[in-house]
Structures are given as structure tokens and as C-alpha cells.
Amino acid sequence: MMEDNVPGFIGYHITRDGKLYSRRIERSPYKFGKWHKLRLSKKARVKVKLYKDGRGYNLSISRLVALVYVYNPNPSKFKEVMHLDNNPLNNNYKNLQWGTHSMNIQQMIFEQRRR
């Protein structure tokens, strides 16, 4: 059985490559838990809806993976998750890094110039 590892949400486990599992909680129709179907937002970001205290929260898979598996050297400064290959569908922890908004924009411009 997988341990809960998503901060602030009981019953959820995120893998290093961005797959989300929820274990069975009372009143749930799933006997043993389930792997969640991920969806794409209008901006081509992979999202999922997690529930806490009966309320749903739409969260980015990249943020969840980064919160659990990617070290943030300065949480008060680095609040944005950057995709190192600029592919928002690649949510493997090795492709994610914490940074500032300006760092993220600079990286995107640099990558576009290289192509």
C-alpha cells in the first residue's frame, strides 16, 4: 500500500512521474482506491481535482510532483515550477525545478532561441 505524500491532502499519493493514486476512504465507491485520470487545461497543463473536507481543488500535477520530490532551496523566493525542457506535459521530477516567474520566462525565451 502506498503512503500518503501530497501535502495537505489525506489519502493521495503522487509518483515521481506525475501519476496520482488515491486510497479508499470511507463512503468511496472504489474498494481499493484508484489511479486518477488526468486532464489538460486550456493552457495545456496537466491538472487534477483533489478533495479535502468535501471541497474540490484543481491543482497542477507539476506543482504536486515538485512539492513532494524537488528540493526548493528558497521557498519564500522560488514559488513557480519550471519545466526544464519547456514541455508542460513532461512532469517527471527530473524535469522540474523551482524558480521565480522571471527565471521561467528567461528560460522559455532561451529555449525558443535555441530551436
Regions found by a protein language model. Name each.
Residues M1-E80, D85-R115:
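Conserved recognition-core residues within compact binding domains
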